[in-house]
Regions:
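Short beta-edge/loop segments at beta->alpha junctions of small alpha/beta modules
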Residues: 10-88
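Hydrophobic alpha-helical interaction segments
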Residues: 143-218
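Short, surface-exposed loop/turn motifs that are enriched in glycine and acidic residues
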Residues: 74, 89-93, 147
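Alpha-helix N-cap/helix-initiation sites
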Residues: 39, 43, 56, 96-97, ...
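Short gly/ser-rich loop at a beta-strand->alpha-helix junction or flexible surface loop bordering the NTP-binding
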Residues: 58-62, 89-129
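A short, charged helix-loop
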Residues: 132-142
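Short coil/loop linkers at secondary-structure junctions
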Residues: 38, 109-110, 134, 203
Length: 218
């Protein structure tokens, strides 16, 4: 490939990135789709753009346009931002949610703040795996079904019940009230629950009974 074509291809990549990503949003090389551009050329152009200062490299396979602070200094991405974009909201599409102890804390079912965040994601590389993003560790789990914007609240509700004994230090009746309010706020009906509850361990029925949780009847 001659130098003119190489330059054109790099400019095309730069415009593609500018049109599809905002400052502070992780760019995963696996998500870049430019017809005719090989993986080898993509890596080459990303390196050139990084060397020129047009974009920044967070870690292998992850780049970004940096935000600037009030002093005009470039701000680096945080591991949590990368984790959210990689495993929870990928290119604006719901692909996962916080789970386990992290979910219990975010739902108000526990006051404990877990050191390692847990996420259930369609992009989980295995059934359960501990992953490291820079200096932070995450537990990534495969969900019982594919996560979508339509079913995420039901899965969070059922996950919370499944892990209720393990993840909360509160009285179960109080947990039931919190989950009942969550169910009402998110219009979680028995019909929606019945679609997924058989994917969960049988102990979930015990949790429903003991918490006296209620959900929308229809």
């Amino acid at each position: 490939m001659n130098s003119l074509l190489i330059e054109r291809e790099m400019i095309m990549l730069y415009h593609y990135l500018k049109e599809n990503y905002i400052p502070g949003e992780p760019i995963f090389t696996g998500d870049i789709d430019i017809p005719g551009m090989t993986e080898e050329n993509l890596r080459y152009h990303l390196k050139r753009l990084t060397d020129s200062g047009a974009i920044c490299r967070f870690e292998p396979g992850v780049y970004y346009f940096p935000k600037t602070d009030i002093f005009g200094e470039r701000m680096s991405l945080s591991p949590d931002t990368v984790a959210v974009h990689k495993y929870i909201m990928r290119r604006g599409k719901r692909v996962g949610y916080y789970s386990g102890y992290t979910l219990a804390n975010r739902m108000g079912l526990s006051t404990q703040v877990p050191f390692i965040q847990e996420i259930s994601s369609n992009f989980a590389p295995a059934l359960v795996r501990k992953m490291k993003i820079k200096n932070r560790q995450y537990i990534i789990r495969r969900p019982v079904v594919e996560v979508t914007e339509e079913n995420v609240s039901v899965l969070q509700f059922l996950d919370s019940l499944k892990d209720i004994e393990k993840c909360t230090e509160m009285e179960l009746e109080k947990c039931g009230k919190i989950l009942t309010e969550f169910a009402r706020k998110n219009s979680i009906t028995k019909k929606k629950i019945d679609r997924f509850i058989t994917k969960y361990p049988i102990k979930i029925y015990k949790a429903i009974y003991e918490t006296e949780v209620e959900y929308v009847s229809s």
